[in-house]
């Protein structure tokens, strides 16, 4: 690996970490754990109804993580779980009124900030960011698969 690649990769990794810290700090500032924050964010983004399986697939969380966060949120009166039609096992997740209020107060403002920040990039920059990030993830997956 070239020295310049090492420095660029280190800078990229710091930026990635900084992005994670931004979300972690925001979640903490509004009184949410990371898992609860991302679960609420996911439910808002995904729309209702959805299942735990949908969330695990969309956000790459372990089922146990989603299950624990959902149980806690159900106990807090933020979500309700109901059996999906024609299912004996899969439950759909619905916001309660308290959950809807929490989403409007804590998640929607962040989503709006994300959208505003993304809109400050021009259309070509947004497209390039997505394309390059996707390509990097695909290549990294391939390289990791070689060492596993």
What residue spans do the PLM features occupy?
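C-terminal regulatory/oligomerization modules of transcriptional regulators
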Residues: 1, 124-148
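N-terminal leader segment of winged-helix/HTH proteins
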Residues: 1-30
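N-terminal positioning helix adjacent to the helix-turn-helix/winged-helix DNA-binding module
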Residues: 4, 35-36, 51, 98, ...
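Short, locally clustered residues in the helix-turn-helix/winged-helix DNA-binding domain
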Residues: 13, 41-47, 107, 134
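Alpha-helical linker/hinge and terminal dimerization helices associated
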Residues: 15, 19-22, 102, 106-118, ...
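N-terminal helix-turn-helix DNA-binding core of bacterial DNA-binding proteins
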Residues: 21-65
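Alpha-helical DNA-recognition elements
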Residues: 25, 68, 72, 135
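Charged, amphipathic alpha-helical coiled-coil/dimerization segments
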Residues: 71-131
